[in-house]
Design a protein with these regions (language model features):
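Acyl-donor binding region in acyl/amide transferases
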Residues: 31-105
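Short loop segments at secondary-structure junctions
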Residues: 13-16, 50-51, 113-115
Length: 169
């Protein structure tokens, strides 16, 4: 991970040592309103069914989620200024107990259209690269000025995401 950070909250059965709940995120360097900051994509949320009601309402999912939020979200050094994710079955519980908000109704953002005919310039060449270098950093530096909010897609991030991915080798 380009941030060098791990963001995981666990619930463990102390009698057996078994992990019974997990709330994790992918920390990201984010460009927001002209400033580099940290954010987190929420991923891999799970609680074993027999443990979901543990501790009464709001249940173990919300308890582990609160621990994650209290630990990683804030304005302190190294904290994420926001988190985001895709809807999960526990979305309503997250909305009620963890402050999840529906930012966008994604099914309104797409429509199938035929691909337009595009002209091809003889001045451009498209090639495959093994690794990203300073040229992609220059591209990102030029592009970020047009963006209000985006994951920083510089060479460090793109190499981690694609070139260094285990499935590439």
């Amino acid at each position: 991970n380009p941030t060098g950070r791990t963001q995981i909250a666990l619930a463990e059965d102390t009698a057996t040592g078994q992990v019974v709940g997990h709330y994790a995120s992918l920390p990201l360097v984010t460009w927001m309103e002209g400033v580099r900051t940290l954010s987190a994509q929420i991923v891999d949320l799970m609680v074993l069914p027999q443990w979901r009601a543990y501790g009464g309402r709001p249940g173990l999912f919300a308890q582990v989620g609160r621990l994650w939020t209290d630990t990683f979200i804030g304005e302190g050094e190294g904290q994420d200024v926001f988190s985001f994710g895709w809807p999960v079955p526990a979305w309503r519980a997250g909305q009620k107990y963890l402050g999840y908000l529906n930012i966008r109704d994604w099914d309104l953002l797409f429509r199938e259209l035929p691909a337009p005919q595009r002209t091809v310039s003889d001045e451009l060449v498209v090639t495959q690269v093994e690794r990203y270098g300073p040229e992609v950093d220059r591209l990102w530096d030029a592009m970020q000025k047009e963006l209000r909010l985006a994951v920083v897609r510089d060479a460090r991030y793109l190499n981690w995401r694609f070139a260094d991915h285990p499935d590439v080798r």
